[in-house]
Amino acid sequence: MRLTPLPAFDNNYIWTLIAPDGRAIIVDPGQALPILEAHSKGLIPTAILLTHHHADHIGGVPELLERWPTLPVYAPHDTRIALNYHRIGEGDSLNILGMRFQVIHTPGHTHSHLTFIGNDLLFCGDTLFSLGCGQIFEGTPTQMLASLQRLAALPIQTRVCCGHEYTLSNAAFALHVDPTNTALQKRRQQANAMRLAGLPTLPISLESELNTNPFLRTAAPTIHAATATHLQRTPIDEVEVFATLRHWKNNFPIKNIP
């Protein structure tokens, strides 16, 4: 299976897993046009996976279903997803084109957010980003941290397929928090070169994220010290470290939406 991110909007990625015969699994098609263009080059939509209900992740589905009415769609139980789809949740598994996906519930960004894991690939929507994490629109810091910790416990060779190209803007905040992290400095340089070349910075290995993403390193002494300085007091616990980082990032001059 060939993994290909298709750019959409300003910074979204629609992830595709394409079999040798062109049949493809599509993750979070916020727009139909990139899929229709790929179809003109041989891609055959076979199934759609949706991580959450936000329009920039599901907006292209109605048009795709007009073109392929029997195309199966798998998504979380959420009344805001106004589609004919298969409702899935924590503990479910999917077998599509010979790939088995484990479904896990990762609340925080939204209440019903799902993540798909298969063949060492992690399709995490807006829960985990390269060098960052999603904003907490519906859940709590405790929920979001727990979701991130579940993902952090996966095998380090797991390749992280995020919903947005946010590496450089996230790197600016991460380096503000953790300026002496040499692995982080190197990642920023590599990401800058890739973007200048017009290349995606994703997927990224979970191992790299564990070494550089402050939202996955809330127990690290350097991150704890940075949040203590920001708060001007010692954080109560790891949840407060995380919540402080998230609030700090929300107000950082270089912002991501979401």
From Swiss-Prot:
Q: Tell me the Gene Ontology biological-process terms attached to this UniProt entry.
A: methylglyoxal catabolic process to D-lactate via S-lactoyl-glutathione
Query: Mind giving the lineage of the organism this protein is from?
Result: Bacteria, Pseudomonadati, Pseudomonadota, Gammaproteobacteria, Lysobacterales
The protein depicted here goes by the name Hydroxyacylglutathione hydrolase
User: Its family?
Assistant: Belongs to the metallo-beta-lactamase superfamily. Glyoxalase II family.
- The question of whether Mitochondrion is a record keyword is answered with no
Q: Which amino acid positions bind Zn(2+) 1, per UniProt?
A: 52, 54, 109, 126
SUPFAM superfamilies with a match to the protein in the record: Metallo-hydrolase/oxidoreductase
List its EC numbers. 3.1.2.6
Functionally, this protein is described as follows: Thiolesterase that catalyzes the hydrolysis of S-D-lactoyl-glutathione to form glutathione and D-lactic acid.
| Subunit structure as annotated in this protein's UniProt entry | Monomer.
